[in-house]
Amino acid sequence: MARIAGVNIPTAKRVPIALTYITGIGPASAKAICEAVNIDATRRVNELSDAEVLAIREHIDATYTVEGDLRREVQMNIKRLMDLGCYRGLRHRRNLPVRGQRTHTNARTRKGPAKAIAGKKK
């Protein structure tokens, strides 16, 4: 198993598919990485030499924010919004949808399980 950005990527899969196992790298980024380091997208990870794996690793480290650093950056952005007290920050603080979705009905994923209210029946 090749280890890139702290993630053991599967060896039997094609290189672009295997790279998507790294948080912060999607299909488009994975294809761009393969093109940047001149690796054919149809090759499998177990066919790569150590030098090619090293080239992928160095390209990702130099170009992309991935894994723990990406998670930390996202959390810091959310914390910044909450500290500012802006509308989006308030929605995060109250665990409500942030992007304008309706909440009168629906939004159960974000709000959690429905809470029973005594005397609500007609």
UniProtKB/Swiss-Prot annotation:
Disulfide bonding pattern of the chain: none
Classification via InterPro entries: Rbsml_uS13_C, Ribosomal_uS13, Ribosomal_uS13-like_H2TH, Ribosomal_uS13_bac-type, Ribosomal_uS13_CS
Highest taxon of source: Bacteria
UniProt keyword list: Ribonucleoprotein, Ribosomal protein, RNA-binding, rRNA-binding, tRNA-binding
Gene Ontology CC, one term: small ribosomal subunit
PANTHER family: 30S RIBOSOMAL PROTEIN S13/40S RIBOSOMAL PROTEIN S18, SMALL RIBOSOMAL SUBUNIT PROTEIN US13M
Subunit and partners: Part of the 30S ribosomal subunit. Forms a loose heterodimer with protein S19. Forms two bridges to the 50S subunit in the 70S ribosome.
The name this protein goes by in its record: Small ribosomal subunit protein uS13
Species: Ruegeria sp. (strain TM1040)
The encoding gene: rpsM
